[in-house]
């Protein structure tokens, strides 16, 4: 596989500046959403700036850390990390410290005929613990800025808008094969043969695998369904058209799993109240 080009690393470096401007111009809810979602959709996959000791800076860690910095430095806001409930604190600490258990139980080396794989050391767990904490940052920030009806609607709007915008490169790749990441970032991020389906291709765009694109499209489709359910009568024709279009895009993804989830989850969104939805999600 070819290596990422200069544009890929340049994107990693400029994304914090882009996010800083979004946090200056948008309300905190939308700024947070597009910092995380935008980075997920357009930043290069499998590309990282490797620094000693600290976690790799990639399309996950850079948006998450940038959002935290913008919230605390630009907005001068205080972000509560640990929940008030003891059970919540225990679960978060267990998630963050789990890499230590992995290291302690994988200290033996593996010996093969041609090579040897060294056992894990305590040093290996340091970056892993930091990575676990970074993964949780969007949840802490989301609790602060998205825990309102307006914040929830902003998430739905962003998912639908992102799905519609992403459909353009998806359609290009479905027709001409997954090439966007090669054209922009200089490499293909997975096994090309896994993109060949049903006489055509599954789009990958800037995500790591075609399944990731399919599940993102599913999320956009479910968000569109929720918006259609709550839309006023005058806005329903447009909302229905977007829903049908995103359903077509899910078919373009040529993945059976997301279709099964769609059939399973759609009735919950349409016919069931929020209390039951939360219980099912739990």
Predicted segments, located by residue:
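Membrane-embedded, hydrophobic transmembrane alpha-helices
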Residues: 1-57
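Membrane-embedded alpha-helical segments of multi-pass membrane proteins
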Residues: 5-17, 42, 56-75, 129-137, ...
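Structural signal for the C-terminal ends of transmembrane alpha-helices
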Residues: 16-27, 42-45, 69-82, 141-151, ...
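N-terminal hydrophobic segments of proteins, predominantly signal-anchor/transmembrane helices
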Residues: 30-51, 61-133
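Interfacial loop-to-transmembrane-helix boundary motif in multi-pass membrane proteins
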Residues: 32-37, 83-97, 130-133, 141-175
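Juxtamembrane membrane-water interface segments that cap and precede transmembrane helices
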Residues: 46-51, 115-118, 191-206
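Alpha-helical transmembrane segments of multi-pass inner-membrane proteins
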Residues: 137, 154-180, 185, 195-272
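Alpha-helical transmembrane segments and terminal signal-anchor/GPI-anchor hydrophobic tails
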Residues: 277-282
């Amino acid at each position: 596989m070819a290596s990422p080009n200069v544009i890929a690393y340049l994107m990693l470096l400029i994304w914090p500046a882009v996010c800083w401007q979004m946090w200056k111009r948008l309300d905190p809810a939308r700024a947070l959403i597009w910092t995380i979602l935008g980075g997920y959709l357009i930043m290069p996959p499998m590309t990282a700036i490797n620094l000693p000791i600290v976690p790799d800076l990639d399309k996950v860690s850079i948006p998450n850390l940038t959002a935290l910095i913008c919230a605390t430095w630009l907005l001068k806001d205080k972000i509560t990390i640990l929940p008030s409930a003891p059970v919540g604190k225990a679960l978060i600490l267990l998630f963050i410290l789990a890499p230590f258990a992995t290291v302690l139980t994988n200290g033996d080396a593996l010996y093969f005929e041609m090579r040897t794989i060294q056992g894990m050391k305590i040093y290996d767990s340091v970056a892993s613990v930091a990575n676990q904490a970074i993964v949780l940052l969007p949840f802490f920030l989301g609790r602060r800025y998205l825990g309102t009806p307006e914040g929830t609607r902003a998430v739905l709007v962003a998912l639908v808008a992102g799905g519609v915008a992403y459909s353009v490169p998806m359609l290009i790749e479905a027709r001409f094969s997954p090439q966007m990441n090669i054209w922009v970032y200089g490499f293909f991020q997975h096994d090309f043969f896994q993109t060949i389906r049903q006489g055509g291709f599954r789009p990958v765009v800037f995500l790591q695998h075609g399944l990731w694109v399919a599940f993102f499209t599913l999320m956009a489709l479910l968000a569109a369904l929720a918006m259609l359910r709550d839309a006023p009568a005058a806005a329903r024709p447009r909302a229905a058209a977007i829903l049908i279009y995103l359903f077509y895009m899910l078919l373009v993804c040529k993945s059976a799993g997301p279709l099964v989830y769609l059939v399973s989850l759609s009735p919950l969104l349409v016919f069931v109240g929020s209390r039951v939805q939360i219980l099912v999600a739990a």
